Amino acid sequence: EFISYELHKKLCDELSEVNYKGLIIYSGFVEPMLDKKIYKLVNYAKIKLPNSRVEMISNGDVLNEKRLKKLYDSGLDRLQISLYDGVDQHYKFTELGKKMNLTNEKYVLRARYLPEEQNFGITLSNRGGMLENAEYKISPMKKKLEKKCFYPSYKFFLDYNGDVLMCSHDWGKKNILGNLKKEKFLDIWLCQKSEEARNKLNNSDRSLNPCNVCDVTGDLIGRKHH
């Protein structure tokens, strides 16, 4: 399922009330380009929050020149394509970017595959410990990391049903801070549960679930790491 237009509008409207100027990323547990209203969502976000950067992370499976143009015409500032299929896929999207005269600022290819001699297919984190039984097995941490994590201090994840998750790596949806359908976003962001989680993680305490089995390096902040 995908987020409703009404819920998306509610978030954008509430962010506008606090003059939000940060980053908005369309990504998540499903491919955002499969949502038929994605262009409408991007356009509303850019109109309502003109000083924000609107980005998307896609696997590229349904992308073509026509859809790329429509995304940028809708207001998308930057597209990141996660490549899992190897160098041929990388070449395909490199040529597409050249054909459309897209700059590195607007169009980024992220190689998620390993070198051919290793040939395991992709590189991943363990997504909050959820990949233990996945095809590309990356086990949960046997001993929790004693390392700071700043992710919940500067980002959050809104699920299609309104749940606000503390972290986008929480694929098991184990740490839900609130629900935007029932509450205002700022109340969720500043709630006691949110503050307690940030205080723990900012002090290298990963005792929270699923942080206690997560292998994500949470002190890497910036475009290369979100």
Task: Identify what each model region corresponds to.
Residues L158-D159:
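Short, acidic, Ser/Thr-enriched surface-loop or helix-capping motifs
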Residues H169-H226:
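Flexible mid-to-C-terminal extensions adjoining Fe-S/redox cofactors in radical SAM and related proteins
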Residues F150-P152:
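Short, small/polar residue-rich loop motifs at catalytic or cofactor-binding pockets
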Residues S4, E31, L79-I81, G162-M166, ...:
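Generic structural signal for small/hydrophobic residues in well-ordered secondary structure
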Residues E1-S139, K144-K147:
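Conserved glycine-rich "GG(E/T)P / GGGxP" loop and the immediately following alpha-helix
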Residues E1-Y5, M166-K173:
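Canonical Radical SAM [4Fe-4S] cluster-binding loop centered on the CxxxCxxC motif
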Residues L145, D163, S207-P210:
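Secretory pathway export signals and precursors
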